[in-house]
Amino acid sequence: MKIYIGSDHAGYVLKEKLISSLKSQGYEVIDKGAFKYDENDDYPDFVVPVAREVSKDPNGSRGIILGGTGEGEAIAANKFPHVRAVVNYGKATPVVDDESDIIVRSRQHNNSNILSLGARYFTEESMMETVNLWLNTPFSGDERHIRRLAKIDGIKID
């Protein structure tokens, strides 16, 4: 599986550590920038190339994007067809009778293919835990989830 990664200055340091870790685990990682720390860079410059690649192969590739909060990054990524970007800040379990972490649900139910991380809210350890959980959780393939995703893909904006 190809993993495309992009980040602005706010996530640059964590991005570099993430790339190293994922490569050591055997993943094919394609860095879409930033390639150096620049506090004046703009996240769309690095998110758009990731989203563009994942949009071309939404079921065979994944993307990880980092920014200060991950919110703007996800908004930009979700402009692309077939991209299902989700924001995450670390472990979160519901208060109801369910033990599933939200990041697990994003894969099982929504087949998320881009993970947008708020770098200001992660340690290196918590980021790696979240990324590994996301990468290793398969889409359930349940008919109801396939049907819902097809409805989303079929939305036409006039």
Residue ranges and their predicted role:
Residues 2-21:
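N-terminal beta1-alpha1 ligand-phosphate binding loop
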Residues 6, 10-11, 91-92, 96-158:
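C-terminal binding/interaction regions
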Residues 12, 69-76, 96-99:
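Short glycine/serine/threonine-rich phosphate/pyrophosphate-binding segments
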Residues 20-28, 82:
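Short helix-loop-beta junction
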Residues 28-40:
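A short beta-strand-loop structural module common to alpha/beta enzyme folds
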Residues 40-52:
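Helix-loop module immediately N-terminal to the HCX5R catalytic loop
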Residues 50-89:
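Helix-adjacent hinge/juxtasegments
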